[in-house]
Amino acid sequence: MHHVLNSTRPDHRFWFYDDVTQYGRTKYLNYYTPLVLLIFTVLFITYNIWKHYYYYDVLHLKQKNPIDELLYSSTDEDEQSPLINNNTITTNYVDNNCTKDALKNRHFSLEKLKSVKVNGEPHGTPEIVRRGFIEKSRIILEFFLVLSQVIIHSFILLHYVNKNPEFTQQGTITGLVEWCALFIIVSLRLANVNQNFKFINKYPGNLWSVSFINYLALFISMILPFRSIFIHHINSPISRKYYISQISINLALFLLLFFARIRNNFAIIYKTDSWITPSPEPVTSIAGFICWAWLDSFVWKAHKVSIKVKDIWGLMMQDYSFFVVKKFRYFVDHKVKRKRIFSLNLFFFFSNYLVLQCFWAFLGSVLSFIPTVLLKRILEYVEDQSSAPSNLAWFYVTVMFVGRILVAICQAQALFFGRRVCIRMKSIIISEIYTKALRRKISTNKTKPSNEDPQEINDQKSINGDEESTSSANLGAIINLMAIDAFKVSEICGYLHSFLEAFVMTVVALALLYRLLGFAAIVGVLIIVAMLPLNYKLAKYIGDLQKKNLAVTDNRIQKLNEAFQAIRIIKYFSWEENFEKDINTIRENELSLLLMRSIVWSISSFLWFVTPTIVTAASFAYYIYVQGEVLTTPVAFTALSLFTLLRDPLDRLSDMLSFVVQSKVSLDRVQDFLNENDTKKYDQLTIDPNGNRFAFENSTISWDKDNQDFKLKDLNIEFKTGKLNVVIGPTGSGKTSLLMALLGEMYLLNGKVVVPALEPRQELIVDANGTTNSIAYCSQAAWLLNDTVKNNILFNSPFNEARYKAVVEACGLKRDFEILKAGDLTEIGEKGITLSGGQKQRVSLARALYSNARHVLLDDCLSAVDSHTASWIYDNCITGPLMEDRTCILVSHNIALTLRNAELVVLLEDGRVKDQGDPIDMLQKGLFGEDELVKSSILSRANSSANLAAKSSTSLSNLPAVKEQQVSVNNNSSHFEAKKLQKSLRTEAERTEDGKLIKEETKEEGVVGLDVYKWYLKIFGGWKIVSFLASLFLIAQLLYIGQSWWVRAWASHNVIAKIIPRAQRAIAFISKKASHLIDWRGSSQISMASAENQPSSGHSTMYYLVLYLIIGFAQALLGAGKTILNFVAGINASRKIFNMILNKVLHSKIRFFDATPTGRIMNRFSKDIEAIDQELTPYIQGAFYSLIECLSTVILITFITPQFLSVAIVVSILYYFVGYFYMAGSRELKRFESISRSPIYQHFSETLVGVTTIRAFGDEGRFMQENLHKIDENNKPFFYLWVANRWLAFRIDMIGSLVIFGAGLFILFNINNLDSGMAGISLTYAISFTEGALWLVRLYSEVEMNMNSVERVKEYMEIEQEPYNEHKEIPPPQWPQDGKIEVNDLSLRYAPNLPRVIKNVSFSVDAQSKIGIVGRTGAGKSTIITALFRFLEPETGHIKIDNIDISGVDLQRLRRSITIIPQDPTLFSGTIKTNLDPYDEFSDRQIFEALKRVNLISEEQLQQGATRETSNEASSTNSENVNKFLDLSSEISEGGSNLSQGQRQLMCLARSLLRSPKIILLDEATASIDYSSDAKIQETIRKEFQGSTILTIAHRLRSVIDYDKILVMDAGEVKEYDHPYSLLLNKQSAFYSMCEHSGELDILIELAKKAFVEKLNSKKD
């Protein structure tokens, strides 16, 4: 043997017996290896020099900087131009040659976003990391090591070539040339160590990579010669010294570069904030990448202290959403030649990463068979030690160990590339959804059947521009697209390589099986192929169920969102139980689909469990009965190991098919959403060349091209530029629609709509007057951000203190800021929840006024404020200095106030212009009715104009302050002055803290508490069900082990008899051909193609075969059974959890909803519930199964080789520490990832509700940037969570490799005491142990991370509840009979730490009397009303109704006994009937009567029988607008978004009329209704509620002037309480002052006197 290995004869074998031959060393390792590397090096450098010379020297192309490519758009050369150019003043900002698409693109293009944050600061700063002393020392040391190699090879060439057979001339010369080339390369790198030589930087390419590849290949080529020295097959001293020096120097060179932090060029890190540590990836060595050591410092810190948000590192520059989406949009817009669907664009965009992922997956799949291939060799050695030398057996064990490590590296890299694609794809999908939601139409209003796509089901959009309801109709579906669909689509990318892995592993396994079993393996393949269609059908069915489930989930989330958005009205009417029942009905449908999916999944699991058993049994049967072979231990266990390896990819393929189908469903939903129609705003609006016109030219406009129930018809209006234009008309006449048409939100059927400009806000140029040619818009229902008051007013405009103060004063907000504890730094909550309706409206108005827009559109902004505030706003804001030379188009019902300074009045009626022109001309035509106040107001226009001119002459800086007595009661001025002084002395930080309303989302620290597990397990079914399931798992695992043991028994009963001659001839032929290069002693008779065949003794083969099948089927049945039982228990637990937290949230105190954004609540009910529904149970099952698998493996190996116990202890300790360190960081990252999702949902919710305002301001870019920022805040913990996962997986694999090595080691130590069957069981389980251990830690971490969802949901079990079903006394059945109210010494706070908002208020209300409550906005009027519903519990005092203290009355009874018509009218998706009579308590005739009484339908229509059938016929014609209230089945969108604000208020009034309550409360119920309709409704209220007690909050003093008493509130105190006429007799009274400031004093005195006289006369009667 030694002679053959070192013979000089021309034997061309590379390997002989147990070692590489001398020919193999000299020819393949010393000659071919350096030759190939030399050719590669020369070609690489030559190609790079040619490429750079040709492109940059010949073609003169600009060399691109990768940083600049990311920072700046390559398509926008003006990207970095100044935002404001003070040297350029122009009125025409629109390039008339610019296409409509280009204009739209400038608004919504993600590619054109600037690399700045929302606040205008740079997005981040790239910083170059230069080489330090250590890195430079590395290159110097490398230089000398390469030089030493040149010297060594020169010495060998001169002294030993042809003298020693190890050193051939061609090999030595080639090696010398190779090292000379490497010496030149390292010299160039050393010379350019500071990157000073442009030639080296520009031409040769990445020389560092060339060096590294060469060193690595040369080091690997020396491993086998070094082994030859180790086993004494090379004995020549010089040869031994040569190979030892080569492996030493090559290893040193390899390690120098392997651990180098900075490679070819300087590393670049990207810093976004000073307190955020940038990602260390750019300065991480290859070693750090492979073993994930770059995360060590983070893991160590997380172990020592609980990490905070600031401790989470930043992302790599290329991973930030801004750069990702920018590159994606550039790719789609410029590199995609034809329009492709979204999914294909994603695929091609990430193709490079996916190819790399597949490369690593392919490599890992092939290497994963090394242990199995070597398993047979080891078992053959155990069975017959003469078959190979012992050093070869040790070599096999070592290779198994190394092979497992290489597989771990490959799998980790494949998963990491996939995860990187995942976070980038998630950024793209969410940003595309968000951008689409900003730019799509809002006018569609369709109802789809329930089996349609869920996005379409919820596609209910606003048709009137009301910001409160613009997008809430489909908000649930959009949240679902983000929270679930975007995640599912992006998540699949992390595992796409599994398809390739499954394919490669299947092919390799089948090839090896064929070599092992021959045609018997084909039988197994055919069975697998036969099972594929069935599994495909099951996977498809699971996908169909998932699609249906997502549709129902959309419906549930929509219903939840609707309930949480309207929680106040639900509590007012005590509808919690009804909504809970409706939501739970949907929930049951969802859970039934989940259960069905689980059953199908279990059937699929059974098939995947049983398939390997059937395949193995069939193959063995064919092998024995047809081929006539006898099963031996090596063959049996090698086959079992291969079938196990085959099962893994098939299992993975099963799961992946299911996941891919689910992801395809999600991707289709996203695609459908992205395919929805965009807004036609930029296509249909005509931009005025002079930049100053608002006009309609023969325009006919509807909300939808196909649905034209309401139209603006034949409009011809030319609005006055730089002047006040007022649009008036009755409720539902189309006033808001007209503004929406100007904003481009409606559908232009014909004609033209001319606007002055449509430029994006970031491109606006400020003119000499400080204005921009843009539009500001204030909606009818105020839209506010969940931020401070100040930030809402600024709306990201630069802060100008003088202008800001002037705006605050002009909008009457100065005193409100003095009342608020934190002033303008007060957080106003979601939708401005902490402010009154009037305050919200004025903040919204202040935003429009503060903007530098030259054109302002105001939609009924005076309706929510009291009369004197309305007068102040009109004089100082709408017609004040700040509005000078600005075009203002105002929609208003308050014609007496608003017409006097109007240049143009447009009167609308039923969608047509009834008349337009100068208000005096229209007055003379009698178009304004007989109201004397209107007449006097218009006729005094000349005087008002003079006053306006006087005000206009006052400069902004000298804008007069608001007189304290003008906006408050005189005797309170000193109080507020003192408060103002006190406030000014406090720091802004203190004010900010005082102003905080929204609580930070809570985050537990450390391990998920044991109480959380106990709580969940109790709901899961308690210890009984857990114990039962655990026993099923144990029995299933015992059966699995029993199968292997049975195979051992089967094979052990065979004895050697004879070898079939035909098999011998085949083996000899194959061996002869295979031994051309490699010769194995003994393997010419025993190869992978066959094994020694032994006839059986004892039981027959059929006996073993049948029992093997029985065990396999039993194990599969148990596996499927435990799966379905686990799913059933999990679904039942999920049902209970959902029901409990829904009940808790719906019955929580209203303060919870004020302090908790809806997006945060929706996060609990969407993503967290989805995790509990679909992820937690499978993860628990998987983790428990992996635990049993690992424990059984360790016990089994220890039983077979007791010495393994020492390894098991060490392995267990290592696993504990690795798991401990991992869990410390990962659980916190998971919590931060969960918390950081809520702001994304909240931001979606806010911005989509205000989409009309955002588009009006042209501020889409800023909101898109903010969305990207919030995505990044979520991506950071998400990304590092999965990097931590890779950190864990690598270490688990390393430790698992020790198990394989230990098992092999102790088998060889105990070789004389073991049979091959026991050794086969030990090694087979050791090979699979690593995978099981990895999944154990990974799945346990997933369990804990998903238990975080349980933990977060459990928090809502501790929400403070309203005292339902708690009562000290039970009122009589007819209570309240009289309606008498007594309020005594009442004080209220919104929260214990907040100041009192109601202060010692006392008053009484007689039965059946009517009380008007008036006062400034924010005076506490609405708070008094809510106190009657016990939204706030009294700090002092009490409220009694009919002499019963309401604090002792059951809440449900109380709230159903009184009725409120709230300030913000709330309707629900459904029909007119379901909104008025949700629980079918009234007849259609009663409902029509209620509609008639609130003037939504006329008596004439009702008498003509305009019922459902006739109205349906009428609605088929589009010639005239149809009254939809004639058909009770007419659809109402969520929030009533397809009705005007006034119509919604009337609907709410009609709903209350139906209930005929004894006490009715009206909170600005007619604020958005025209005065004429208001008068009729007030008459209806007086008539219909004669026997009821009425409390009305009103800003229109005329509405309550004839009431029995007026309650004047100010700053939470009662200032006056008497008959209105009595109050007016006192000219010093606050009420008199209010009437005086309203401009209606004389009329109000007359009406009050008339009511007073009538009351006196009625008493006499």
Swiss-Prot record:
The chain crosses the membrane at residues 34-54, 75-95, 134-154, 167-187, 206-226, 346-366, 394-414, 496-516, 520-540, 603-623, 645-665, 1054-1074, 1115-1135, 1179-1199, 1201-1221, 1293-1313, 1316-1336. GO terms for molecular function: ABC-type transporter activity; ATP binding; ATP hydrolysis activity; ATPase-coupled monocarboxylic acid transmembrane transporter activity; ATPase-coupled transmembrane transporter activity. Coiled coil: none annotated. One of its GO terms (cellular component) is fungal-type vacuole membrane. GO terms for biological process: calcium ion transport; monocarboxylic acid transport; transmembrane transport. Residues 55-74, 155-166, 227-345, 415-495, 541-602, 666-1053, 1136-1178, 1222-1292, 1337-1661 are cytoplasmic. Glycans are attached at residues 6, 97. Keywords: ATP-binding, Calcium, Calcium transport, Glycoprotein, Ion transport, Membrane, Nucleotide-binding, Phosphoprotein, Repeat, Transmembrane, Transmembrane helix, Transport, Vacuole. Residues 1-33, 96-133, 188-205, 367-393, 517-519, 624-644, 1075-1114, 1200, 1314-1315 are lumenal. The modification Phosphoserine is found at residues 936, 940, 955. Residues 354-662, 1026-1345 form the ABC transmembrane type-1 domain. Gene3D superfamilies: ABC transporter type 1, transmembrane domain, P-loop containing nucleotide triphosphate hydrolases. ATP 1 binds at residues 729-736. InterPro entries: AAA+_ATPase, ABC1_TM_dom, ABC1_TM_sf, ABC_transporter-like_ATP-bd, ABC_transporter-like_CS, ABC_transporter_C-like, P-loop_NTPase. Residues 445-468 are annotated as: Disordered. It is a multi-pass membrane protein. Residues 694-935, 1381-1636 form the ABC transporter domain. Signal peptide: none annotated. ATP 2 binds at residues 1415-1422. It comes from the Eukaryota. Vacuolar class C ABC transporter which regulates the translocation of phosphatidylcholine to the vacuole lumen, the release of lumenal calcium stores, and acts as a negative regulator of vacuole fusion. Exhibits ATP-dependent bile acid transport. Present with 3000 molecules/cell in log phase SD medium. Belongs to the ABC transporter superfamily. ABCC family. Conjugate transporter (TC 3.A.1.208) subfamily. This is ATP-dependent bile acid permease.
